[in-house]
Amino acid sequence: MKKLFAFIACALVCGAMSAQLKVSIMGDSYSTFTGSMPKYYDTFYPNQFCGVTEQSQQWWAQVIEKNGWQLEKNDSWSGSTVCCRGYNHDDYSDRAFVTRLNCIGNPDILFIFGGTNDDWTHEPFGDYKYSDWTKEDLYFYRPAFAYLLDNLKKLYPKMKIYSLLNDGMSENLGESMREICKHYDVPVIAVEGIEKRMNHPTAAGMTKIAEQIQAFLDSEKK
């Protein structure tokens, strides 16, 4: 009888583990943490000045812990843009989100936290375009973001995608992200009132981001 109970308990635990949702992150510096991403990616965290010194303080780590999920891949590269154009009009094809769409593993959920650097480069946003992209199109945020979501939807048809909108961004970025996400039925979670140093979230800022994401996730369950 004891062996039977042990077998049932093991089966329940294994079943729970197999049902655990896998989460991937596609982001820029806000989502980096050394040791959680590919070694050759540029990173910003841990950062003593911002007070974020442990991976558990990262916004995504808090959300994953809160929901009992597991991290699949953190594909975040500090300073990266969604499109292939970066600061000083440099070519960012090697680190652009559109280049990294095959690097997220096989998650059930994907959080995309990008657009901040695209906004800060002050490059043109381009036109809304939802098909027949050219290589040149991918150097502009609007067509590049549409290309990203379109391909993610096709490559991972069962995956749930959330797009995070940083606070303090231009109206142009906010409108562009919302319009493109609406086209692909991707929820936008706009975070607000985030404490920052050097334009990056502090430990308190990370917690604020996590809390606002959690509030959005909880609202979906109602």
Can you describe what each PLM-predicted range is?
Residues 1-20:
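Bacterial Sec-dependent N-terminal signal peptides
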Residues 93-222:
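Alpha-helical cap/lid subdomain in secreted, periplasmic
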Residues 26-27, 164:
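Short hydrophobic segments within beta-strands
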Residues 22-24, 39-126:
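Conserved SGNH/GDSL esterase-like catalytic core that processes O-acyl groups on lipids
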Residues 30, 78-81, 168, 195:
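Residue-level detector of flexible, active-site-proximal loop/helix-junction positions
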Residues 30-31, 205:
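Short active-site segment of divalent metal-dependent hydrolases/proteases
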Residues 33-35:
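Short N-terminal binding/cap micro-motifs at the start of the first secondary-structure element
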